[in-house]
Amino acid sequence: MTTDYLKIGRASELTGRDHALYRFLEILPGLLSWSTLLVLIILSYFQPVWVAMFVIAFDVYWLLLVIYLAIILISAYRQITHNLRVDWRAQCLALPPVDLVYTPLEGEPVVSVGVKWSDLYHLVIFPCYNEGYNIIQPSIEALIKSSFPRDKMIVILAIEERGGPAIQAVAERLRQEYENSFFQFRVIVHPDNLVGELKGKGANQAWAARKAKEEIIDPLGLDYNLILASVFDSDTVIYENYFYCLSHKFLTIKKPYRHSYQPIPMYHNNIWQAPFFARVAAYSNTFWQMMQQIRQEKLATYSSHSMPWRALVEIGFWSTKMVSEDSRIFWHCFCYYRGDYEVEPLYYPVSMDVCMDETAWQTARNLYKQQRRWGWGVENVPYLMFNTIKSWRVIPRKLFLDKIFIQLYGFHSWATNAIIIGCIGWLPLFLGSDRFNQTVLSNNLPNVTRILMTIAMVGMVLSAIISSLLLPPRPVKTPWWRRLGMIAQWIFLPVTIVVFGAIPGLDRKSVV
């Protein structure tokens, strides 16, 4: 039987040389990160001059990178604020009918003639496990409050059988409240312990999508080319014009069927109640996603996003064996369409929950686990490299190699940069010999590092300003001085980057 390499989840699913190759590629990201750190630690003892010179050069690189990213962040912020002011409903109404051309990998193009925004259906899937009514209900209510016609929405509440009676009771309550509010509203239960599945969102939402196809879309004869599928985390609250913005983008870009559509996650649902370190981590993630939207070549799907139903059906839905199903769906499409698939930035936000628990300590533990779970995205690196090797003769090689470098560099820098600057950069002073400590370089290393990092604090100041501008209004019962904390919290950014960024990223790479 021929192996479908595009559906591979890990090396254990392969045999022989394929297993050995994929296993090596799985180890590679962690090997590179740990090797970088260990080599610098060892050289700090044997060759402290080399490490000191490297640290100074790295600090200069970091400073230039901070300035570059600050410019990009400002540009992204301006684009977001512009898109929030746009009347996307009016923009859609003003659009003339367009002809959409879908080109399969094999066969003749299919043309949908004279498509208007009102012809589109939006399939919305909320995968849930053990979330409570108070988490899910605002997400569905946001669909009600949006200005997009609800008779064009198919809403699926995808719950897990293993969630037990609690989630089933929540789902039944929501079904009773909303089953007549949309074109279709269904609760779909994902069975537990299905063979070949990893317990996670990917398997749940893939099951829900297949059932939606079998029980709703196919029986009603809906046109695959006129459906956009959105998978939202259960706490995702859309803004009023999200589906108008999405529809407008779909109807106006080239190759709409070869794009996924990515909003910007803003963790505003409970931002005023969350501890300061959780807020800093949440905004740091938002800022990174904002900057990625400007740098489209680096953008992959993340968390809540939308994509053409046609593409989703063609590739066989989400992987049922991955932790990072949100990004894997993009890389699956990218490899399936041989590089002719991109992520289109929407520059439009959705609101989600900050990681938060009953106590600060529990929040810190859960935040670390969340960051570590996000670090599972590194599993896409061996997937991309392996499929590049297997498809070497039929793919645009430079494009694939560029993507591999971007992904490998991104996960490597996530796990190492902050540790190099915050910890290893000082080791030559402690591990170097007395001879090194008597040199001019040794005396100047702390001063040079301090000056460069002080200048680089422009990024921290900018983060405080933009986060304040994006912040939702202060709740009535929240004291006024809490706003001061929203600014002062950024003092802890360096520590947060290490504790809730680099360390969980490195931790995840150590599990191979």
Residue locations for each model-derived region?
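Membrane-interface alpha-helices
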Residues: 153, 507-512
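Structured alpha-helical bundle/scaffold domains in large eukaryotic membrane-trafficking regulators
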Residues: 75-86, 220, 383-390, 427, ...
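C-terminal catalytic/acceptor-binding lobe
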Residues: 334-420, 424-440, 497
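N-terminal membrane-anchoring/stem segments of glycan-assembly enzymes
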Residues: 1-111, 501-508
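Internal catalytic domains of large membrane-associated glycosyltransferases
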Residues: 78-379
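Basic, amphipathic N-terminal segments
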Residues: 2-8, 275, 288-289, 384
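Membrane-embedded multi-pass helical conduit in multi-pass membrane proteins
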Residues: 36-76, 406-509
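Loop-to-transmembrane boundary segments
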Residues: 12-32, 107-136, 198, 392-419, ...
